[in-house]
Amino acid sequence: MKKTIMILAMLAAFALQAFAAVYNVRDFGAKADGVTIDSPAINAAIEKAAADGGGMVYVPAGRYASYSIRLASHIHLYFEKGAVLIAAEPKNGEGFDAAEPGPQPQFQDFGHSHWKNSLMWGIGLEDITISGEGFIDGSNLSGGYGDNVVVNGVANKTIALKECRHVIIRDLTFLKGGHFCLLATGVEDMVLSGLTIDTNRDALDIDCCRNVRVSDCLVNSPYDDGIVLKASYALGRFMDTENVAITNCNISGYAVGSVLDCTYKKFAENPYSNKAINPHTGKVMYHRAGGRIKLGTESSGGFKNIAVTNCTLQYCGGLLLESMDGGHLEDVVISNITMRDCVDSPIFFRLGERMRSPEGTPVGTIKRVLISDVNCWNNTSWYGIQITGTPGHYVEDVTIRNVHINYEGGCSKADALKSVPENIKAYPDPWMFGCRMPVKGESPIIMPSKGMFLRHIKGITFDGLHFSFNQPDDRELIVSSDVKDVIMRDVTFEGKPVKGL
């Protein structure tokens, strides 16, 4: 009996100690008035908690204008419902932490190469949690293009993590996350769950990471990628992204902010009225919508043991699998996916030779990929499915099973490319072969195939692939060249069998 009482007393003491390890940012001077810069108070709370061995840094309801928040190991940063963290506008010589010094990035852009110029950042940490029902407003963050990319005091990411372990980010809501809402580079054991992200560029960038679980996230990113895996050379070494599971997520490309307010605004049907900034060039472009699930483009390292399942894509891009810089993309399974009103290629593979890697890096590979149980309705017809390698470098061992693709149709072979260039070094996207949206007064330029374009492939199985069109389209269903060892079972066009290539 005495032993039992002693154990209970010890447990109670432990519980009280755990309860006591809460550091309220208001106790450290945070005003929460939306005007006063509260990051010094938040950082003071984090520093105190870290010095005490860890604990919860508690952000109660209120509006917290902030510059860079410096995370620490063994810290749980918790935002109560009603807490709004506002990325403050740099002014009067004050602003966010400067990007850490280092050599000019050779193989990836500035945004991928720095972490401290962020609203929240951590380097070399472990046991970090950021959670709660709070709201993170990054409206004053840089989109990562233009003249302010490298200016001190300007931040271009909401959360940036480098070489951290045991990370949990859950249940928060984000608006306008900058160039990256999350950039995680070289992170091991990370859980991203229950996040709502309505952002202007990339939402979740998972770069050179291992053992990652992404689940139950709502992601809207009209001008760039939704959930994207990368394997850049940002750490100065080759590193794969591997053992990643993505499940139960909704991806879209509606106008920024319109998912959070539940209006789901589409771009006008006339593409000329949709001026936007091309995130890769900084120039004005005419845009319908973006967002997608993607492996690449940065691919000095590879992608291994990846599973994507039970996700929806709406009014956005599709599924993109790319090896451009020498990485090996292999052992990937994608299943139980629905798409509606998607605006470029529903399924896009590209093995290319951009080679943004150290000199002498060989061309990469794409092999052992299974895509199954995909239903796509009312996809734009300009691009179709595209699966392409380059001369002498084949996409290999791919199975596409039980996939239904419905296209808008209404295109004409008069607008199609007469020949499709190799473009082995071009940026990999469905328009990379010379396609374009309509220029005012001119027709679009589209792919010669209305259903699927295949080139430089070895060993591919189509088992239950079904095409249908909402309007007539007089282009060839499938255009292929240099394709070896193809198996076609139960491939149909408008319910009628397609016998072969």
Each language-model region and where it sits:
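Positively charged n-region of N-terminal signal peptides that target proteins for export
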Residues: 1-4
